[in-house]
Amino acid sequence: MTTNPAIDDDFTMIQSIINTYFTGLYQGNSDQLKAIFHPTAMLKSPGNFRSLERWLEDVETRATPKSLGQPFNFKILSIEIIQDQAMVKLECPLFDHFYIDFLGLLKEQSRWLIVNKMYTDIAQTSDVTAV
């Protein structure tokens, strides 16, 4: 089996972005999060659409999982890369919630950025369906 070094590099870069995402969420570091999102990114959950700017304000003003002594239990569930686009599925336990995030990333000018975040709290429902 042969590997493609470009895909391996992309995979490593995306993993690094996701690790930054996890750390930023855990520590409430909005500057760290802002650096990995495209400025026009939208964050969406059922009934809740926010701009990146609004979400970062929310992150800055809430308590952090780290300050509350909560465990760092974030997990990458999958990464799919097709040329200059990627979709990442994550587990993000935060506070009393258990979020599943889908992050859409695009690679432009050799740099990956998160352009879209969709998330839902599966702690409130048992509606998890895979096809």
Language model: regions and residue ranges:
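Beta-strand-connecting loop/turn residues
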Residues: 39, 84, 110-111
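Low-complexity, flexible helical/coil segments
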Residues: 70-73, 78-82, 113-114, 123-130
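Short beta-strand edge/turn micro-motifs at domain boundaries
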Residues: 98-128
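Short, low-complexity N-terminal intrinsically disordered segments enriched in polar/charged residues
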Residues: 1-27, 31, 35, 39
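Outer-membrane beta-barrel domain signature
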Residues: 37, 43-51, 124-125, 130-131
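Surface-exposed, charged secondary-structure patches
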Residues: 6-13, 42-98
